[in-house]
């Protein structure tokens, strides 16, 4: 799709760890598609893989901060300020590590297809929703959230590894990040 020089606000939600180069990459992609990025945000949410990290986020304080940011964006628009904010990140971008794994599916799967319908990259075939193409999976964990039978989850060794890693780097309350 093409932006036609439309103004845009970019968001990269992160799970109380770090958003790394996500906003920089997103802003570059938006600009390449013809959008004029005028603001960016990296709000905190519950981590998609280890839900105890960032649990309860966004909360009331986050909602107030997001509302204030929206007001600042509106004020920027009303002033006619189309400047693009500087966001953290590195060029060249980090190389993506090919991690061909995906959530596991238990016998509880009733093949309702909700996970396939909700998968943003089509890694779960509609005709075989009890399978996942690990090479296409982006590990967003949407399928685990929408499964009515809780039949999809991370494999236990992966959960243990991530819990150990994230416990070291994601403790405490991290701040939302806003860029105007």
Q: Where are the predicted features?
A:
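Iron-sulfur cluster-binding cysteine motifs and their immediate structural context
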Residues: 105, 110, 114-138, 142-159
């Amino acid at each position: 799709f093409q932006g036609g020089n439309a103004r845009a606000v970019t968001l990269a939600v992160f799970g109380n760890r770090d958003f790394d180069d996500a906003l920089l990459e997103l802003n570059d992609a938006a600009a390449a598609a013809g959008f004029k990025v005028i603001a960016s945000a990296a709000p905190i949410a519950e981590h998609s893989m280890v839900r105890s990290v960032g649990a309860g986020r966004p909360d009331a304080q986050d909602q107030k901060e997001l509302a204030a940011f929206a007001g600042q964006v509106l004020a920027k628009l009303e002033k006619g300020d189309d400047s693009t904010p500087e966001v953290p990140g590195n060029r060249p971008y980090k190389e993506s590590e090919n991690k061909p794994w995906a959530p596991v599916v238990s016998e509880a799967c009733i093949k309702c297809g909700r996970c396939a319908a909700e998968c943003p990259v089509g890694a779960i075939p509609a005709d075989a929703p009890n399978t996942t193409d690990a090479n296409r999976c982006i590990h967003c964990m949407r399928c685990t959230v929408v499964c009515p039978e809780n039949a999809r989850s991370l494999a236990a060794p992966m959960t243990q590894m991530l819990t150990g890693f994230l416990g070291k780097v994601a403790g405490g309350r991290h701040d939302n990040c806003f860029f105007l």
